[in-house]
Amino acid sequence: MSLLSALTSISKPMNTSSKSSVSSKNVSGLSMGSNSIACGSCGGSYGYPGAGLLAIVDLNVNIDIDINLSATRSYSCGCN
Protein backbone atom coordinates (compact mmCIF):
# COMPACT_ATOMS: atom_id res chain seq x y z
CA MET A 1 0.00 0.00 0.00
CA SER A 2 2.79 2.45 0.76
CA LEU A 3 4.28 1.93 -2.70
CA LEU A 4 0.93 2.67 -4.34
CA SER A 5 0.44 5.85 -2.32
CA ALA A 6 3.99 6.94 -3.13
CA LEU A 7 3.37 6.47 -6.85
CA THR A 8 0.13 8.41 -6.61
CA SER A 9 1.79 11.31 -4.81
CA ILE A 10 4.61 11.37 -7.37
CA SER A 11 2.26 11.35 -10.36
CA LYS A 12 0.10 14.24 -9.10
CA PRO A 13 2.84 16.92 -9.06
CA MET A 14 4.02 15.76 -12.47
CA ASN A 15 0.55 16.31 -13.90
CA THR A 16 0.28 19.82 -12.49
CA SER A 17 3.75 20.80 -13.68
CA SER A 18 3.00 19.63 -17.21
CA LYS A 19 -0.19 21.70 -17.27
CA SER A 20 1.61 24.82 -16.11
CA SER A 21 4.42 24.37 -18.62
CA VAL A 22 1.95 24.05 -21.49
CA SER A 23 0.07 27.16 -20.43
CA SER A 24 3.24 29.17 -19.95
CA LYS A 25 4.43 28.27 -23.43
CA ASN A 26 1.17 29.57 -24.83
CA VAL A 27 1.45 32.84 -22.94
CA SER A 28 5.07 33.46 -23.85
CA GLY A 29 4.42 32.41 -27.43
CA LEU A 30 1.63 34.94 -27.77
CA SER A 31 3.66 37.79 -26.33
CA MET A 32 6.71 36.95 -28.43
CA GLY A 33 4.53 36.70 -31.53
CA SER A 34 3.10 40.18 -31.04
CA ASN A 35 6.56 41.62 -30.48
CA SER A 36 7.99 39.94 -33.55
CA ILE A 37 5.22 41.45 -35.68
CA ALA A 38 6.22 44.94 -34.53
CA CYS A 39 9.96 44.53 -35.15
CA GLY A 40 10.40 41.16 -36.85
CA SER A 41 11.90 42.52 -40.07
CA CYS A 42 14.38 44.76 -38.27
CA GLY A 43 16.43 41.84 -37.00
CA GLY A 44 16.15 43.12 -33.44
CA SER A 45 16.59 41.06 -30.32
CA TYR A 46 14.24 40.76 -27.37
CA GLY A 47 15.25 39.90 -23.82
CA TYR A 48 13.06 37.64 -21.73
CA PRO A 49 14.98 37.30 -18.45
CA GLY A 50 12.43 35.09 -16.72
CA ALA A 51 11.22 32.97 -19.63
CA GLY A 52 12.66 29.79 -18.15
CA LEU A 53 11.01 30.41 -14.80
CA LEU A 54 7.57 30.97 -16.30
CA ALA A 55 7.18 27.23 -16.93
CA ILE A 56 7.03 26.59 -13.18
CA VAL A 57 4.35 29.16 -12.37
CA ASP A 58 0.62 28.83 -13.06
CA LEU A 59 -1.15 30.52 -15.99
CA ASN A 60 -2.68 33.35 -13.94
CA VAL A 61 0.68 34.28 -12.45
CA ASN A 62 2.32 34.04 -15.88
CA ILE A 63 0.02 36.67 -17.29
CA ASP A 64 0.89 39.05 -14.44
CA ILE A 65 4.63 38.39 -14.78
CA ASP A 66 4.52 38.82 -18.56
CA ILE A 67 2.77 42.19 -18.23
CA ASN A 68 5.34 43.35 -15.67
CA LEU A 69 8.25 42.20 -17.82
CA SER A 70 6.85 43.92 -20.90
CA ALA A 71 7.10 47.26 -19.11
CA THR A 72 10.80 46.76 -18.31
CA ARG A 73 11.78 44.79 -21.42
CA SER A 74 14.38 46.46 -23.61
CA TYR A 75 13.80 46.52 -27.35
CA SER A 76 16.58 46.94 -29.88
CA CYS A 77 15.55 47.39 -33.49
CA GLY A 78 17.71 48.21 -36.49
CA CYS A 79 15.13 50.20 -38.47
CA ASN A 80 13.31 53.27 -37.20
Curated annotation (Swiss-Prot):
Region (Disordered) location: 1-29
UniProt similarity note: Belongs to the hssA/B family.
Low complexity bias spans: 9-29
Cross-referenced PANTHER family: HSSA/B-LIKE PROTEIN 1-RELATED-RELATED, HSSA_B-LIKE PROTEIN 1-RELATED
Domain of life: Eukaryota
Protein source organism: Dictyostelium discoideum
GO biological process: sorocarp development
InterPro entries: HssA/B-like_chaperone, HssA/B-related
Highest classification ranks of the organism: Eukaryota, Amoebozoa, Evosea, Eumycetozoa, Dictyostelia
Record-linked Pfam families: Coiled (PF05710)
Protein name (record): HssA/B-like protein 2
